[in-house]
Amino acid sequence: VVLTPNPHAHALYADKRNLALLSDPARLAILGVAQPTIDVLRAGIPRTEEVTPERADALWAARRGLFFKPAAGFGSRAAYRGDKLTLRVWRDIIDGGGYVAQSIALPSARRVRIDDEDSDLKLDIRAYAYMGRIQLVAARLYMGQTTNLRTSGGGFAPVFLTRSEDFVPA
């Protein structure tokens, strides 16, 4: 029997509190991480910090630019966009602990034709890996606050890869 993700690896790597370290250039430099690596991490990981009672007032004031996610959760379960956050839910987040605040990274969008109508769908790209190797790359198309598989015309879409040397920036 193979469990994926491996429970031990999941416990080590899936906790979103790791993103607080990986998105903090000063802490990475103290740990001896090379500047080119820090630059790559900064480009790919939105600024993330743990939600603590000590930071509650500052995070509440900055909430419109943040997304709040359970540190140990996955998907969009119990995740809240800050500009839609109610004070009651905010109190639950602070009282319950175990959340991170992440700078909002707006998704890209693609125009698609559904039943002869043009529609703009948000998208994200996912790389599914096993044993350190990418097995599948897919796009998820959706409308709304978080990804879902209920959007008309949405769901999974293929991603066509090209060689990096063929890429010419616009």
Enumerate the language-model features and the residues they cover.
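Domain-scale recognition of functional cores that engage charged ligands
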Residues: 1-170
